[in-house]
């Protein structure tokens, strides 16, 4: 799941996948703004066939936060 997540983030935010770690913060480390995050969430929803409510998005600061959230929805790593 981490590799797939890195690919999505790299494509959506235009960053090198090698610079993405579990503790990478979307805002602080990748300089993502609210529009970037919105587009990233849409891409994650499409890739994993899930829906992430807007209220939950604000709690997803790092790559690991998203992976743990997806695991909580029953997706396997």
Q: Across the structure, where does each feature detected by a protein language model lie?
A:
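Thiotemplate assembly-line natural product biosynthesis machinery
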Residues: 1-18, 72-76
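Amphipathic alpha-helical interaction surfaces in cytosolic regulatory modules
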Residues: 31-41, 63
């Amino acid at each position: 799941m981490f590799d797939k997540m890195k690919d999505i983030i790299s494509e959506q935010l235009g960053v090198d996948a090698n610079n993405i770690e579990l503790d990478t913060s979307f805002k602080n480390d990748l300089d993502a703004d609210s529009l970037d995050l919105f587009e990233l969430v849409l891409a994650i929803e499409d890739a994993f066939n899930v829906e992430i409510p807007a209220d939950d998005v604000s709690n997803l600061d790092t790559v690991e936060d998203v992976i743990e959230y997806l695991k909580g929805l029953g997706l396997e790593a």
